[in-house]
């Protein structure tokens, strides 16, 4: 019997770990429609395990993500642990059984990418990975910060300068709220 298996290893905690509430660095996964983010120090104290039907897992830092996407429609066990090295892995719960002169193929996708919205969205779309955009942490106010990011990015592409993009974004926000501000006086 054979089991599908994948593992990511990180030797040590990054030296420039910010440990700042705005940006998550550490273990990240989206398993059965649940986003799970675990810090390095939490995993050093206690390992994390979850059985899931679908999803992805990885280790991310400020600018990069390394992720595994297990075979679809198969139950797998995800584990984040620390034994002299940080490990994020999965193993299928059901074995692959082969008879003589038979073969089987399973695809495990590995993605090592920059945390750029266009790159991550490209992988999510081309490889049909649900909620892969969550590797980029927009914070708990993502419903505000993500559209603001796209607006500033649009102005940057239009104007070629982030300073001008921020000024243009500020003008648009001020214009949107002008009637409300004018009404209060």
Task: Describe these PLM feature segments.
Residues 101, 173-185:
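Membrane-interface amphipathic helices and adjacent TM-edge segments
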Residues 111-162:
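Interfacial loop/helix-cap signal at membrane boundaries in integral membrane proteins
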Residues 95, 138-142, 182:
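Generic amphipathic alpha-helical segments used as scaffolds and interaction surfaces in large
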Residues 63-64, 162, 178:
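Aromatic side chains
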Residues 1-132:
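Soluble non-transmembrane domains of integral membrane proteins
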Residues 152-155, 172, 176:
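Alpha-helical membrane-inserting segments
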């Amino acid at each position: 019997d054979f089991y599908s298996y994948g593992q990511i290893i990180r030797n040590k905690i990054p030296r420039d770990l910010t440990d700042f509430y705005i940006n998550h660095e550490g273990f990240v996964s989206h398993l059965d429609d649940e986003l799970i983010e675990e810090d390095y120090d939490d995993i050093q104290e206690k390992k994390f395990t979850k059985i899931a039907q679908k999803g992805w897992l990885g280790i991310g830092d400020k600018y990069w993500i390394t992720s595994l996407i297990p075979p679809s429609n198969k139950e797998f066990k995800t584990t984040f642990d620390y034994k002299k090295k940080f490990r994020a892995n999965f193993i299928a719960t059901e074995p692959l059984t082969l008879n003589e002169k038979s073969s089987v193929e399973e695809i495990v996708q590995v993605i090592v990418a920059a945390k750029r919205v266009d790159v991550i969205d490209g992988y999510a779309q081309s490889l049909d990975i649900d909620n892969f955009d969550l590797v980029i942490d927009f914070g708990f106010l993502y419903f505000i910060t993500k559209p603001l990011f796209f607006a500033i990015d649009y102005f940057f592409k239009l104007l070629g300068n982030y300073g001008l993009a921020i000024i243009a974004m500020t003008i648009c926000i001020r214009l949107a709220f002008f009637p409300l501000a004018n009404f209060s006086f």
